[in-house]
Amino acid sequence: MGEGAGDRVLSRLHSVRERIGDSLSAHPNELVAVFTRLKNLGKGMLQPHQIIAEYNNAIPEAEREKLKDGAFEDVLRAAQEAIVIPPWVALAIRPRPGVWEYVRVNVSELAVEELRVPEYLQFKEQLVEEGPNNNFVLELDFEPFNASFPRPSLSKSIGNGVQFLNRHLSSKLFHDKESMYPLLNFLRAHNYKGMTMMLNDRIRSLSALQGALRKAEEHLSTLQADTPYSEFHHRFQELGLEKGWGDCAKRAQETIHLLLDLLEAPDPSTLEKFLGTIPMVFNVVILSPHGYFAQANVLGYPDTGGQVVYILDQVRAMENEMLLRIKQCGLDITPKILIVTRLLPDATGTTCGQRLEKVLGTEHCHILRVPFRTENGIVRKWISRFEVWPYLETYTDDVAHEIAGELQANPDLIIGNYSDGNLVACLLAHKMGVTHCTIAHALEKTKYPNSDLYWKKFEDHYHFSCQFTTDLIAMNHADFIITSTFQEIAGNKDTVGQYESHMAFTMPGLYRVVHGIDVFDPKFNIVSPGADLSIYFPYTESHKRLTSLHPEIEELLYSQTENTEHKFVLNDRNKPIIFSMARLDRVKNLTGLVELYGRNKRLQELVNLVVVCGDHGNPSKDKEEQAEFKKMFDLIEQYNLNGHIRWISAQMNRVRNGELYRYICDTKGAFVQPAFYEAFGLTVVEAMTCGLPTFATAYGGPAEIIVHGVSGYHIDPYQGDKASALLVDFFDKCQAEPSHWSKISQGGLQRIEEKYTWKLYSERLMTLTGVYGFWKYVSNLERRETRRYLEMLYALKYRTMASTVPLAVEGEPSSK
């Protein structure tokens, strides 16, 4: 395994129980002291830092040295939680990402036993229920459906599903000539709206295919490389070849070479290249129902932020890639991309009430808005993303009808976004038999600690019973799952990934999930997005700078007037600015940034603080945002920050926001993203793309985007004083050595160029769609058994829970 101390121990001993048992024999007094201390804390749950703190307090430092190289300390450091129900202490041990073991120690008798997942979850349930629940409890277990399906075993393989799948299935399917027939049948069946592509009926066998390809290759070798397809299509048809091989002799020859190589010596990389050249994606539907989805005047509204920006940038990049591939294949087909969202009739000042809206900067992408509907008619009010569940089934039926009218065909790919979009995408893909891709953006279970165990406390406001069930259904139904980072899937050595947290959990009184998802599943693929380079570009590119916007940016930052767009003033405009921009909700933690700034006088001396969030002119109806709004005012008053802080209302103009990042660069400032958890961190990418040194949360995607100390800095939002000290250190260094600012700025730009661009993203997404579409056709990747199980979960559990979520009461104005 070779992945650190935990893996070293794993390779030496067979189980956690044996490791603890051996340690008890070798160091009985020390282990008894630790477990007794944990037991004496009484009934409850301990987090990793609490477990280690109790260990350090129980054993003197000199004695701990004896345990340093032993198994016990490794076990404790790998523990993600401890459940204490005297005289028992149970530990959930995670030696490496995606691998878990469970053990329980009877402290009175010094008995150690290993627990199966259901046993551990049943024990954990006693934290909220009196005594063990011996009644029959629904247990969800998806593992049997995947038992015969290949999966990698190394943590480094997580998120590289398509490479693993290609390697495995290539060797399985293409072990002899006869096994190549699925590929032949796939090419023969390939068509668009009844138009035959690739092969016609003249080719019925592999030998006929190879013969035709060789003759075509021979013919192409007599032509100029740029000879258009129209000049050799008659010869191709005679041979049994149709459109799709290439728009010119050179490209057609390259495609034919790939297929001949594949037929001669099957190879996973050749297969991926070949499938990447075949025209497979013409119509795409992207689902994002909740929030205010529009191209202007919506960012900062409730439930409206990075996801909207992500999708708009995504479709522009996808259209470019689809047009390029279709042209290179020699086809005259117009692709279509539909972003399907909710129609909001009363969203004045936005286009959210408009049924169809063309996406700017594209030719064939549209936003299609479909209203929520009940038996009483169209729902006009904005509805929180936590309360959409009772509307989605009817919404899916309405969307299916609207899509059919717009596309006049089934889509080739359906992409879901967030929990609600993923459920609608899942239902549509299931109904239409279409390739289904899931993008979570954020799984709420990881954002609200213990929201599974204590779900009943959250239910009235958040309805997590519906949401977590939806997430399980969508992630298990999807043909492939895209994440922006490894951490989304499997965290890191210390923290649990978003998807990983769904491997095993319990919602007492509802169900136990003993195997919800496998992070080693080859459906997981890391495909990182970028920033829109027409808006976000380096501050040094002076010829592109929008200097005409500087007067209004200066008004925004430095005006001594307070109004509905900006509150509080900056007394010293010569200081650098630390800047943050996000939705005003608890998880984004902008109030935490204000507090750490308020507590550090030296930081106030060095820099001004500018936060962009909320709307001073239009109070939110979202309860969480209301609470954060009040907290922000209270903190500014408590720390007497007027003169040091500028609080600007959410800014809807992305073009001006791009120049705002660059203007902050001119002040030699920095961007701070202080979220408790951030799935990806699009604002982090935007800031770095503009050259703005960035400090971002260590929890989630930014930890991967930023290389600490090279292209930015990681901060711990739970340790505000340490974060503010890091900021002070940075700005002190910049004062003493101005080149330090430029060094970090340049490091950020280099990091973006290497890994985070939309061009790389769209190329990968199109290839993934082709590869998964092919394997779905030629193998049991369709996972029919899983889908029957999901139908039952949806029909018997989800629908009942969704029906308990209150419907919106019409009559009140439905503004933000």
UniProtKB/Swiss-Prot annotation:
Q: Which GO terms describe its biological process?
A: sucrose metabolic process
Instruction: Please tell me whether the keyword 4Fe-4S is annotated for this protein.
Output: no
Q: Which EC number applies? A: 2.4.1.13
Q: Which UniProt keywords apply?
A: Glycosyltransferase, Phosphoprotein, Transferase
Question: Cross-referenced NCBIfam families, in alphabetical order?
Answer: sucr_synth
Q: What is known about what this protein does? A: Sucrose-cleaving enzyme that provides UDP-glucose and fructose for various metabolic pathways.
In its UniProt entry, what is this protein called?
Sucrose synthase 2
- Species this protein is from: Zea mays
Name the encoding gene, please.
SUS1
